[in-house]
Amino acid sequence: MKVLLANPRGFCAGVDRAIEIVKRTIDMLGTPIYVRHEVVHNRFVVDDLKQRGAIFVEELHQVPDGATVIFSAHGVSQAVRRQAAQRGLKVFDATCPLVTKVHLDVARHCRTGRDMILIGHAGHPEVEGTMGQWDQERGTGRIYLVENIDDVAALHVAQPHHLAYTTQTTLSVDDTRNIIDALRQRFPTIQGPKNNDICYATQNRQDAVRELARECDLVLVVGSPNSSNSNRLSELAQREGVASYLIDSAAEIDPAWVIDKHHIGVTAGASAPQVLVDGVLARLYELGATSVSEHSGKPESMVFALPKALRLQLVD
């Protein structure tokens, strides 16, 4: 049984930045430090930060007045930002810069009075934050959410000739392309972003899984069940005709999965650390793996700057 590692896999620049923001804030200011929502969608990462002193909450009313709060990588609505300011909270923003780009795009279309369509998954925190950039006090029009082609067919917009779209950053590239095609067919004058809003890491990891699926008869995706990009990786492998499972850690591997399997692919979502992948490889060796090799893959060199207040050199 041979194991093939996807490349790239695991942490992206936005996740690296978000985790480092929490760690540095704790180091510089001490505890307690509050984090609104899981800073990234990975149980191992969140548990590690809890042990360091981070307190995770879902809403700002759980944060004491005047305390320090970090916004997660998924971003927050304008209403949350206003509430934080009104309550005198000290805020560090771990929103991924690629999500911020989408937020700015939505705000720009709001100011021009266009209607806006967001392609995304209802209930996901990134979608809630992006929908919340639409400020009725600063513009007219409306923002609509579509999740699939059927939603596009059923959609009724107030301004079909004054319309734009954007997307959640962690979607299936293939699904999103099909939805955009449906939007353009129904609304020929719709405006889109200059560049694809699917993030580079999402695109690269999906391309890598597609390569794995061509060579493997099983693909294991390391990632938490609430991770959008991790779920998309497992779904993509299945669409390519390969059995695939999303696992939080090596402990979730069922030995029955690898029976009669000759080539097992392993990848990790953008919020899953390498230490979890290492644990999966160790478990696969216990189950009979004889070798591990790695695809050459697409190099990633993206680095996002920390907030200015956290760039100061820490002094022991």
Swiss-Prot record:
Residues annotated to bind (2E)-4-hydroxy-3-methylbut-2-enyl diphosphate: H41, H74, H124, T169, S227, S228, N229, S271
Annotated Pfam families: LYTB (PF02401)
Pathway it works in: Isoprenoid biosynthesis; dimethylallyl diphosphate biosynthesis; dimethylallyl diphosphate from (2E)-4-hydroxy-3-methylbutenyl diphosphate: step 1/1; Isoprenoid biosynthesis; isopentenyl diphosphate biosynthesis via DXP pathway; isopentenyl diphosphate from 1-deoxy-D-xylulose 5-phosphate: step 6/6
Catalytic activity of the protein: isopentenyl diphosphate + 2 oxidized [2Fe-2S]-[ferredoxin] + H2O = (2E)-4-hydroxy-3-methylbut-2-enyl diphosphate + 2 reduced [2Fe-2S]-[ferredoxin] + 2 H(+); dimethylallyl diphosphate + 2 oxidized [2Fe-2S]-[ferredoxin] + H2O = (2E)-4-hydroxy-3-methylbut-2-enyl diphosphate + 2 reduced [2Fe-2S]-[ferredoxin] + 2 H(+)
Keyword set includes Transferase: no
Binding site for [4Fe-4S] cluster: C12, C96, C199
InterPro entries the UniProt entry points to: LytB/IspH
The enzyme's E.C. designation: 1.17.7.4
Record's keyword terms, sorted: 4Fe-4S, Iron, Iron-sulfur, Isoprene biosynthesis, Metal-binding, Oxidoreductase
Binding annotation for dimethylallyl diphosphate: H41, H74, H124, S227, S228, N229, S271
Binding annotation for isopentenyl diphosphate: H41, H74, H124, S227, S228, N229, S271
One BP annotation, GO: isopentenyl diphosphate biosynthetic process, methylerythritol 4-phosphate pathway
Record family assignment: Belongs to the IspH family.
Name of the protein this chain belongs to: 4-hydroxy-3-methylbut-2-enyl diphosphate reductase
Organism: Xylella fastidiosa (strain M12)
